[in-house]
């Protein structure tokens, strides 16, 4: 193509006006036109005109002034140019971004204007671009000044401040006293046991038993128990409006010594007069016998009473329905008492006796005595305000911080990780009952802690203050100041000459706590009027009203406020809420401090950056304003304000050209040229040529140029990826992951919360909870069981048939063996029953009085028979002949002699000695025969051969032993002599 054709083509393509109204110049078409024909002067001249038009005017005039000249040249030389047909629509780009597409020629674009001729080179360049596959592109029109903005002036940054008034000090925390009031009491009573026993012929059984406790009279306590350590065996008691009398062992009244009891619990002592009960059984059967036992018992036990102290209980299980603080004094008369006045007695200067040591107390006491229907109770009277207290000390805190926050005080205790909240007004101890002990214990504990830890470093800045915290905890707090801070305060007071205001300066909250209240007016404050003659009626009315007020005040007794008018402080059983409050306050303080410091630092940083923004907006206003507004805008500085226009998002396609070179061989584009459409599905007529800006911004002009340089390398962001150009020619796409990122953000380094462990705390221990009731039931059960063991001989009255139990056990055993075993068991049990019955009969006979008498007589008869038998045996041993044959005695012999006419004085020489010797031998033989028979019987019984042999040998020996038997004479010599 000739140069003229190039000029016409270039002029025709470059005469399109954009939104800015400037004529766009295209120099990329000249290299692709055909070379002009040789000798074509007009073409060469038009080429020169084209080059002239392509060169920028030195004066900067717009190309519109030369439009007429260019149009005229084109009309004259139009026929010398060869026009090539182009396709109606450009083919879509191939899948490869860098590939060049080919199109057919010879087709005219119907969308062109009638006067516009399609240029195939222009379409070829357009189709050689790279389509942006993803990403958002924007186009920004130039600002005209219709919308202007300004940068905000610097702000005033907040200062970090907690906004609290902290005060350190020492505190003592009190809780509700749920433990009962304990004291020692003495119980006096006499235990009466009346038994009725039935005596049968062979058995004795307990038919009835009556047991009762009766009180010991106060006079007997004075005269015997506390005076001598003894007690009377007589008991007087009123039952059913009848006065009854009982005597121990049914005998006359005597004084018995009180001895320590064998059975006593660890927390109590007891004394009694006897350990046995009397059970009398007479000798006559088939009748009842009644016996009485009186045991005087004195017990020293523990007594308990709980608020409102209108009764107290004893460890014996007895409950006294009277206040332990009741007495005859003025302040004690208002206490509760359910008994008649004659049952109560109070003794001043009483000295009780110790029944163990038998010594009286050295210090006298005020003793109260109450006589109930069953016992008499005595205890030492004390004043209620001194002994009883509804609050008790829970914790001593050596380091406490109090701060005021939103109209309340917060007491933080780090040692137990707890925070208590209370009102800013102090709590009056007079509004709670029985709190006199609080001030004393609090002062002692605080002074002790101060002397141990803070005496050399701190000074007190006020008196003890009392605050009622949530949960029912009373906090006794005394503020302190360090010595250094106290010196600063003193120097300030001396400098300002306000030494009289030292206390208020050291403790500024003291005035707020001591709120003055308006005194209520009453008729008592009005002096009693004196009657006058002028106003008698009015003075009488005032006199009556004043009198009624005095009577009402006297009846109410305002000096002694009852417990019903006061509110008892109730304490929760757990302080988990206080521990959670401490944790929340700790976290809140840390977070608030952190956020406050961040806010202050952030504000300071923004003020410093504002100066940088103000200077940077002069260099690149569009980028600065877009970053500030977080929106794509085009900006231009108009003096002290900035004109902006909002950028429009490109909905159509954006094509990136492969080359960044311009028509001038020495000039190149500094940013890649693009072709885009504003809307989707737009034809070639709606395509716009522009240039790729920063952050996917599309310029509608291609005015960013630079001199061409060697070894040029550029990376440009195109959509969501980057494109790489080398020597002003597209090379490839670069993913963002291949490019290393350097962060411009500043990391925010925050301090984490410190670790804090929650310690389990018990407001009331297990022992305290078990000790809250009036009665200790375990102590009662032990006492009752041991009390039953005091009379340990009761079981001796009741007989238990243990034989029947044994027989039943044997019968059960045999039944388990089957039918055969049951038959054998019946036989065995029958025989055993007979034996047992016999033995039982004998035992019953022996238990019977008549049986005992018969046994006694039999024993005596046996002894007499034994005596005579013993005498007979001794007689046989001394003179067996006389015992066995009394005829041989001397008396018979003398009688025989007398019958024959002989005198008693005759000599005994006439006695026949031979016969006497024969008699002796016969007796000896008889004894040996008797012994032999016994030996033979034993041998036969034992069935032993040795015994039989010995018996036979003895028989043989007896046969050979002794003189030979001689026959006696037929006639007696004496008879013969008499006959002569």
From Swiss-Prot:
Q: Where are the transmembrane segments?
A: 850-870
**Feature type site, description Cleavage:** 521-522
Where's the motif Internalization motif?
965-968
Question: Which cysteines are disulphide-bonded?
Answer: 140-647, 157-603, 231-296, 389-437, 668-708
Residue spans of biased composition, Low complexity class:
96-118, 505-516
Give the residue interval(s) assigned to the motif Golgi targeting.
925-928
Q: According to the lineage, what is the superkingdom?
A: Viruses
Name of the molecule in the record: Envelope glycoprotein B
Where is carbohydrate linked to this protein?
A: 165, 275, 380, 423, 497, 514-515, 560, 727, 749
The residues on the Intravirion side of the membrane are 871-980
Protein family according to the UniProt entry: Belongs to the herpesviridae glycoprotein B family.
Q: Give the GO terms filed under biological process for this record.
A: symbiont entry into host cell; virion attachment to host cell
The residues forming the signal peptide are 1-86
Which membrane topology term applies here?
Answer: Single-pass type I membrane protein
List the ranges whose topology is Virion surface: 87-849
Question: What task does this protein carry out?
Answer: Envelope glycoprotein that forms spikes at the surface of virion envelope. Essential for the initial attachment to heparan sulfate moieties of the host cell surface proteoglycans. Involved in fusion of viral and cellular membranes leading to virus entry into the host cell. Following initial binding to its host receptors, membrane fusion is mediated by the fusion machinery composed at least of gB and the heterodimer gH/gL. May be involved in the fusion between the virion envelope and the outer nuclear membrane during virion egress.
Region annotation (Hydrophobic membrane proximal region) ranges: 794-847, 823-843
Q: Where is the composition biased (Polar residues)?
A: 1-14
**In its keyword annotation, does this UniProt entry include Nucleotidyltransferase?**
no
């Amino acid at each position: 193509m000739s140069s003229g054709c190039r000029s016409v083509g270039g002029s025709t393509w470059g005469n399109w006006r954009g939104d800015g109204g400037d004529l766009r110049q295209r120099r990329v078409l000249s290299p692709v036109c055909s070379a002009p024909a040789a000798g074509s002067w007009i073409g060469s001249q038009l080429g020169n005109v084209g080059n002239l038009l392509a060169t920028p005017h030195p004066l900067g005039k717009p190309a519109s002034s030369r439009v007429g000249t260019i149009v005229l040249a084109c009309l004259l030389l139009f026929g010398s140019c060869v026009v090539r047909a182009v396709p109606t629509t450009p083919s879509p780009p191939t899948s490869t971004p860098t590939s060049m597409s080919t199109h057919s020629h010879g087709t005219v674009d119907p969308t062109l204007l009638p006067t516009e001729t399609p240029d195939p080179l222009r379409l070829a360049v357009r189709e050689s671009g790279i389509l942006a596959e993803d990403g958002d592109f924007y186009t920004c029109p130039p600002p005209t000044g219709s919308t202007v903005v300004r940068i905000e002036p610097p702000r005033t940054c907040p200062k970090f401040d907690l906004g609290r008034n902290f005060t350190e000090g020492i505190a003592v925390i009190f809780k509700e006293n749920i433990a009962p009031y304990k004291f020692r009491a003495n119980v006096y009573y006499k235990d009466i046991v009346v038994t009725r026993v039935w005596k049968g012929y062979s058995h004795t059984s307990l038919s009835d038993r009556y047991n009762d406790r009766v009180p010991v009279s106060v006079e007997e306590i004075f005269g015997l128990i506390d005076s001598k350590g003894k007690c009377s065996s007589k008991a007087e008691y009123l039952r059913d409006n009848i006065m009854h009398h009982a005597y121990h062992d049914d005998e006359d009244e005597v004084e018995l010594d009180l001895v320590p009891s064998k059975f006593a619990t660890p927390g109590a002592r007891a004394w009694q007069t006897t350990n046995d009960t009397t059970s009398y059984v007479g000798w006559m059967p088939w009748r009842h016998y009644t016996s009485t036992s009186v045991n005087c018992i004195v017990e020293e036990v523990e007594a308990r009473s709980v608020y409102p102290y209108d009764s107290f209980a004893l460890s014996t299980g007895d409950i006294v329905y009277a206040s332990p603080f009741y007495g005859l004094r003025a302040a004690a008369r208002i206490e509760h008492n359910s008994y008649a006045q004659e049952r109560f007695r109070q003794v001043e200067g009483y000295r009780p006796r110790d029944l163990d040591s038998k010594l009286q107390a050295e210090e006298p006491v005020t003793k109260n005595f109450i006589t109930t229907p069953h016992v008499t109770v005595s205890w030492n009277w004390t004043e209620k305000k001194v002994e009883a207290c509804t609050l008790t000390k829970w914790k001593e805190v050596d380091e406490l911080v109090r701060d005021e926050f939103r109209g309340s005080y917060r007491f933080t205790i780090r040692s137990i990780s707890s925070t208590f909240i209370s009102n800013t007004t102090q709590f009056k101890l007079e509004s709670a009952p029985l709190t006199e002990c609080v001030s004393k214990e609090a002062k002692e504990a605080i002074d002790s802690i101060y002397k141990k830890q803070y005496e050399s470093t701190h000074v007190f800045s006020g008196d003890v203050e009392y605050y009622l915290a949530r949960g029912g905890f009373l906090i006794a707090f005394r503020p302190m100041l360090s010595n250094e801070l106290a010196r600063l305060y003193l120097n300030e007071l001396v400098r300002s000459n306000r030494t009289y205001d030292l206390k208020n300066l050291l403790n500024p909250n003291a005035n707020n706590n001591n709120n003055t209240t308006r005194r209520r007016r009453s008729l008592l404050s009005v002096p009693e009027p004196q009657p006058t003659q002028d106003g008698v009626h009015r003075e009488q009315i005032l006199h009556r009203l004043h009198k009624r007020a005095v009577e009402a005040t006297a009846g109410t007794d305002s000096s002694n406020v009852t417990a019903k008018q006061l509110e008892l402080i109730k304490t929760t059983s757990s302080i988990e809420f206080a521990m959670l409050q401490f944790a929340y306050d700790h976290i809140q303080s840390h977070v608030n401090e952190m956020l406050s410091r961040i806010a202050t630092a952030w504000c300071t940083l923004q003020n410093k950056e504002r100066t940088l923004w103000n200077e940077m907006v002069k260099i690149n206003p569009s980028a600065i304003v877009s970053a500030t507004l977080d929106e794509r805008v085009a900006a231009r500085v108009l003096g002290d304000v900035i004109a902006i226009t909002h950028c429009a998002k490109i909905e159509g396609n954006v094509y990136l050209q492969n080359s960044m070179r311009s028509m001038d061989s020495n000039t190149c584009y500094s940013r890649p040229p693009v072709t885009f459409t504003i809307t989707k599905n737009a034809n070639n007529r709606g395509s716009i040529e522009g240039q790729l800006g920063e952050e996917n911004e599309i310029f509608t002009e291609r005015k960013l140029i630079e001199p061409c340089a060697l070894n040029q390398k550029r990376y440009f962001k195109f959509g969501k990826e980057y494109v790489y150009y080398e020597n002003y020619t597209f090379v490839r796409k670069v993913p963002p992951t291949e490019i290393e990122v350097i962060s411009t953000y500043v990391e925010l380094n925050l301090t984490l919360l410190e670790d804090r462990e929650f310690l389990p705390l018990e407001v009331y221990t297990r022992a305290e909870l078990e000790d809250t009731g009036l009665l200790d039931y375990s102590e009662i059960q032990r006492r009752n069981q041991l009390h039953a063991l005091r009379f340990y001989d009761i079981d001796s009255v009741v007989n238990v048939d243990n034989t029947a139990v044994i027989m039943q056990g044997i019968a059960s055993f045999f039944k388990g063996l089957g039918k055969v075993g049951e038959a054998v068991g019946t036989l065995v049990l029958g025989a055993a029953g007979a034996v047992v019955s016999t033995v039982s009969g004998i035992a019953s006979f022996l238990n019977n009085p008549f049986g005992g008498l018969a046994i006694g007589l039999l024993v005596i008869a046996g002894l007499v028979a034994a005596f005579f038998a013993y005498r007979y045996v001794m007689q046989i041993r001394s003179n067996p002949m006389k015992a066995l044959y009394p005829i041989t005695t001397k008396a018979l012999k003398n009688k025989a002699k007398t019958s024959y006419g002989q005198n008693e004085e005759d000599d005994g020489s006439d006695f026949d000695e031979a016969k006497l010797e024969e008699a002796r031998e016969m007796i000896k033989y008889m004894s040996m025969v008797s012994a032999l028979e016994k030996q033979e019987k034993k041998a036969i019984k034992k069935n032993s051969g040795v015994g039989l042999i010995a018996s036979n040998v003895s028989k043989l020996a007896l046969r050979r032993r002794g003189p030979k038997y001689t026959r006696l004479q037929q006639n007696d010599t004496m008879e013969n002599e008499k006959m002569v």
